[in-house]
């Protein structure tokens, strides 16, 4: 390695070590390319997902679910002696999981021949990036580059982050004291997940949403199931509410705004602002390249994820679309194939999405509403979880499985699941859609009994008018 101001040369520079970046770097190395992976987080690679998002949040959600389940033990004949939370111990446990996975990813990079460079990258030209904060590498000259810098939380002017009282999703996963009253502004998937989690930990949660209902954009029948459960957990829902400002009063944060046009105040100990994310591209100095961005700052790419500068590619949150780690995984593999000389192209056909609330939500393909809006003629099959024996044995009968299929061909177009284990069930649906499966392909596949995946069989049969374990009158 060259030390000082002389640039290091590599075939491909990957900027950002999150899900898209490290997967792309490893696959490039597997395909014979010399790769340098630049990561600005001194703690290690993994990005928001591994360090401050997907992994730590699911660990804490798992802990909250275990705590919530304790409330139902007596119904099963199990007597408990009471449960309490040690938030510091919980953070140590969560941190251990993150550290283990991060070390594992770094080791995979090294074993595959990916060189990791810690520092912040910025473009000096379409062939060179400068590196700040690294004493060994000042710059990297590349033949191709991949931008995988992810996204950052959107900040509201009325509620600027201070990292202590008004926090983002990052800080919400690092709290060493469970807040007595937590206000969650924004009821998208991050807000819903965090709000549900803290409600189970014992916080009085107040959820604020500008739209007319929580989880805007999702099907109403899905949302109603989650609303019911949130109310059971004591969560207060303030829909149609817009926050204009805040003040501190008697040790509390008091938000002021309007709900459906009428003045309202909401008080709490902490405020989690979760109103979306924006591309993390401001420090890249893209003006030194031919890379173009759209009006929202997302990097423009074609079907090969190539930017308007033909030497530079971009993947993951920074290009927009569904901000999902598994989407970034696939984009990283596609770009690696393209750079290595393949003919791969990115196709957004079946990207599953999951909300780890209670009950879980998972969906893939088109929704029933989307199909109707597009004037498509479809078949719908819907089975409640209460029709599944396994759901009863788990004390989780809230929810349903819905399939959407083309009316004439029976080709599967979409699946929506709300219920226990939805995050695991959706993968079979994604595979079915990706392979162009028809309703009978699901219906005729023998599923073990009693299991939750039987819901997919029953829903497919319902769409065909042949459901066994659920009766609905034929229209």
Regions found by a protein language model. Give the residues of each.
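Flexible, glycine-rich terminal cap/loop adjacent to redox cofactors
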Residues: 15-43, 48, 55, 59-66, ...
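Glycine-rich flavin
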Residues: 2-10, 27-178, 211-215, 221-222, ...
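Beta1/beta-strand and adjacent pyrophosphate-binding region of the FAD-binding site
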Residues: 6-18, 178-185
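Short hydrophobic core segments
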Residues: 13-15, 121, 140-150, 185, ...
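Short glycine/serine/threonine-rich phosphate/pyrophosphate-binding segments
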Residues: 20-24, 166, 191-194, 200, ...
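FAD-site-proximal beta/loop scaffold in flavoenzymes
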Residues: 162-179, 265-339, 432
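Glycine-rich dinucleotide-binding loop and its adjacent helix/turn
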Residues: 54, 149-204, 208, 233-237, ...
């Amino acid at each position: 390695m060259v030390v000082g101001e002389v640039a290091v040369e590599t075939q491909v520079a990957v900027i950002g070590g999150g899900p898209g970046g490290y997967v792309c770097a490893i696959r490039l190395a597997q395909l014979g390319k010399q790769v340098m992976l630049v990561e600005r987080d001194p703690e290690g690679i993994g990005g928001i997902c591994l360090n401050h998002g997907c992994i730590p949040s699911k660990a804490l959600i798992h802990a909250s679910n275990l705590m919530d389940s304790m409330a139902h033990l007596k119904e099963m004949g199990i007597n408990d002696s009471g449960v309490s939370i040690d938030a510091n111990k919980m953070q140590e446990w969560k941190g251990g999981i993150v550290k283990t996975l991060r070390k594992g990813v770094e080791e995979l990079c090294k074993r595959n021949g990916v060189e990791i460079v810690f520092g912040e990258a910025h473009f000096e030209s379409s062939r060179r990036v400068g590196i700040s904060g690294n004493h060994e590498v000042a710059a990297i000259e590349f033949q191709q580059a991949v931008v995988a810098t992810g996204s950052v939380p959107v900040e509201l002017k009325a509620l600027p982050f201070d990292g202590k009282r008004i926090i983002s999703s990052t800080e919400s996963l690092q709290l060493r004291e469970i807040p007595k009253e937590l206000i969650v502004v924004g009821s998208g998937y991050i807000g819903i997940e965090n709000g549900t989690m803290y409600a189970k930990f014992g916080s009085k949660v107040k959820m604020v949403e500008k739209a007319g209902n929580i989880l805007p954009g999702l099907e109403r029948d899905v949302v109603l199931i989650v609303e019911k459960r949130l109310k059971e957990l004591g969560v207060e829902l303030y829909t149609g509410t817009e926050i204009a400002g805040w003040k501190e009063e008697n040790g509390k944060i008091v938000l002021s705004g309007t709900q459906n046009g009428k003045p309202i105040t909401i008080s709490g100990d902490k405020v989690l602002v979760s109103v979306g994310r924006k591309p993390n591209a401001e420090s890249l100095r893209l003006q030194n390249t031919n890379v173009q961005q759209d009006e929202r700052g997302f990097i423009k790419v074609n079907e090969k994820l190539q930017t308007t500068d033909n030497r530079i590619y971009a993947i993951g949150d920074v290009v927009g679309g569904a901000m999902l780690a598994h989407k970034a995984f696939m984009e990283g593999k596609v770009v690696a194939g393209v750079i290595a000389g393949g003919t791969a192209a990115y196709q957004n056909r079946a990207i599953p999405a999951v909300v780890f609330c209670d009950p879980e939500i998972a969906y893939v393909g088109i929704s029933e509403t989307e199909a109707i809006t597009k004037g498509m003629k479809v078949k719908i099959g819907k089975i409640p979880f209460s029709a599944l024996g396994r759901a009863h044995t788990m004390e989780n009968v809230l929810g349903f499985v819905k399939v959407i299929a083309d009316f004439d061909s029976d080709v599967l177009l979409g699946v929506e699941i709300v219920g226990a284990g939805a995050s695991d069930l959706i993968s079979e649906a994604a595979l079915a859609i990706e392979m162009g499966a028809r309703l009978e392909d699901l219906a005729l596949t023998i599923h073990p009994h009693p299991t939750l995946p039987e819901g997919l069989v029953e829903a497919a049969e319902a769409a065909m008018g042949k459901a066994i374990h659920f009766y609905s009158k034929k229209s």
